[in-house]
Amino acid sequence: MENSPRYREATNLIPSPRCHNSNNSCGMSSSSESNKPPTTPTRHVTTRSESGNPYPTTFVQADTSSFKQVVQMLTGSAERPKHGSSLKPNPTHHQPDPRSTPSSFSIPPIKAVPNKKQSSSSASGFRLYERRNSMKNLKINPLNPVFNPVNSAFSPRKPEILSPSILDFPSLVLSPVTPLIPDPFDRSGSSNQSPNELAAEEKAMKERGFYLHPSPATTPMDPEPRLLPLFPVTSPRVSGSSSASTS
């Protein structure tokens, strides 16, 4: 009876104790597999990583209907929009390895720490801008009580002295009066000319169109400059040969 085919089939259906300890449902898998119809191969993800390559290559098998969803699932960011979170992924798809997806390497946002140097520089720049605008619209009036030396720190002088020098501004200090003296740079000698010479000079200006300034006799005259010949009359070769022949 032990050699009959029915007894052999019954012994094959008895689950093994090893399988019973690991999973209770694996004992009936052999009988259920014979009754299941042939199913289509599920989509799987294979990862091929080379030694020393931090970015492994992922191969995904998908059809045209779910290709877009698989690409978004593998390359999408960790924070998806609200309308994308409501869509549930297809249970037939295998979840990719979280170590191979870039979403696991999310960098935390950097907290903006206020810099003291930047705040101080911006405050100083704002103060400088205000100071420039106030200097553009500045109007100085010595009679104004604002510029009174009692109320201001420009000068500790008496308030009855109303002059531009009370503000201690160099540009407002009055310049000294220059006395009216003969021009030392006037070399025309018009002050030493007689009325006859002035009349002759005016006549020459009307007739000839130039000024008549006679040079004083006391001016030392330089000797006439020596004029060098531009084109020599004799050749140096000829002069050298003639001198050699005479010697």
Curated annotation (Swiss-Prot):
Example of a GO biological process term: defense response
Q: Does the keyword Coiled coil apply?
A: no
Provide the protein's localization.
Nucleus
Low complexity biased stretches = 21-37
Q: Which InterPro entries match?
A: VQ, VQ_4/11/13/19/31/33
Query: Could you tell me which residues carry Phosphothreonine?
Result: T178, T219, T234
Task: Supply one GO CC term from the record.
Answer: nucleus
Residues spanning the membrane = none
Task: Name the domain of life.
Answer: Eukaryota
Task: Give the location of motif VQ in residue numbers.
Answer: 67-76
Q: Which keywords fit this entry according to its UniProt record?
A: Nucleus, Phosphoprotein, Plant defense
Indicate where this protein is primarily found. nucleus
List the residue ranges of the region (Disordered). Answer: 1-128, 184-247
Pfam families in UniProt = VQ
What modifications does the entry list under PTM / processing? Phosphorylated on serine and threonine residues by MPK6 following treatment with the pathogen-associated molecular pattern (PAMP) flg22. MAP kinase-mediated phosphorylation after PAMP elicitation causes degradation of VQ4, allowing WRKY33 to promote transcription from defense genes.
Compositional bias (Basic and acidic residues) spans?
200-210
Which positions bear Phosphoserine?
A: S16, S106, S155, S163, S165, S175, S194, S215, S235, S239, S243
Give start-end positions of Polar residues composition bias. Answer: 48-75, 87-106, 236-247
Q: How does it assemble?
A: Interacts with MPK3 and MPK6.
The job of this chain, per UniProt, is described as: Acts as a negative regulator of WRKY33 transcription factor activity in the promotion of defense gene expression. Acts as a negative regulator of pathogen-associated molecular pattern (PAMP)-induced responses to modulate resistance to pathogens.
Q: What is this protein called?
A: VQ motif-containing protein 4
Q: Which species?
A: Arabidopsis thaliana (Mouse-ear cress)
